[in-house]
């Protein structure tokens, strides 16, 4: 049976192929996200997943709220968001919907033989060449894990081909992954130094195609409640206002990590600097406790609710904007974006604690307000407000 996701991706890929430039030594392209239906997921589940990704200690109240939601025993059921946005690619002959993740460096997906594959679309391994002796494994503090083998195959994203891309194929996955039907795996866009393939780490798609791009950059335009785009090889001035504010990247841990020069709440500045990671693979914004507490002190009725796993408030509450200072530029998250999701009787905040991991995570709640340029050659990030 052909599902709607397959039809959408086939149409999207054919349209992209028609619009894409012919491959050359220097090229550029855009690829659009597509919408897929997703089940209702309590925001505490996503919060726990984000902490686990960075091996942070998951507070007991967050773990409890997430477990209750996943077991179906939660008192308050979340309202289902209609859609989630993923990006279509081809690996060999297979069309896959992947989550493009600037917080990891593995391209991994499912095959028909994956234990726990569920309803995911799968990669046809017959088109690839298995890498002898290579394996990979990821495991997180929330108990989720995946592991498998590695193939080399042609991977096409938009108008550019990586002719020998490592495709990490899961042989087994935990229930946390198999039950998440919103994507068919990840395409990591962090630095190749944190790729998990053993004994020899593999290059990311970006590193493999970077030399063929007109400019060695990619840019991200995520959207609030709408599909976004990823631009490779060029900067699209029509997608942002004013000038890009650049800041240096510290990639020593393999992430797109930088120092924010301060923060503001409701337009009032003065907050101290903090280290942060730009991460398209994390939904929420995770900050130091002191900043989180300061923010919600400005929201009438907000409370850190242990039963919900984080800060909640009345859904009609007026939330202040949150600003991240980058040089002379303030990247502003509109307050309405921070009203992340309903838990039934209250709404869950898009800003939550980073559980003391030593840096902040600026996930989609932040990125959906910005046009962000990722420049791996010059080790810098550029930010501007979306047009």
Swiss-Prot record:
Its main location: secreted. Residues 20-66 form a propeptide. CDD domains: Aspergillopepsin_like. Residues 85-384 form the Peptidase A1 domain. Residues 1-19 form the signal peptide. Glycans are attached at residue 304. The keyword Glycoprotein applies. One of its GO terms (biological process) is proteolysis. One of its GO terms (molecular function) is aspartic-type endopeptidase activity. InterPro entries: Aspartic_peptidase_A1, Aspartic_peptidase_AS, Aspergillopepsin-like_cat_dom, PEPTIDASE_A1, Peptidase_aspartic_dom_sf. Belongs to the peptidase A1 family. This is Penicillopepsin-1. It comes from Talaromyces stipitatus (strain ATCC 10500 / CBS 375.48 / QM 6759 / NRRL 1006). The lineage of its organism: Eukaryota, Fungi, Dikarya, Ascomycota, Pezizomycotina. The gene is pepA.
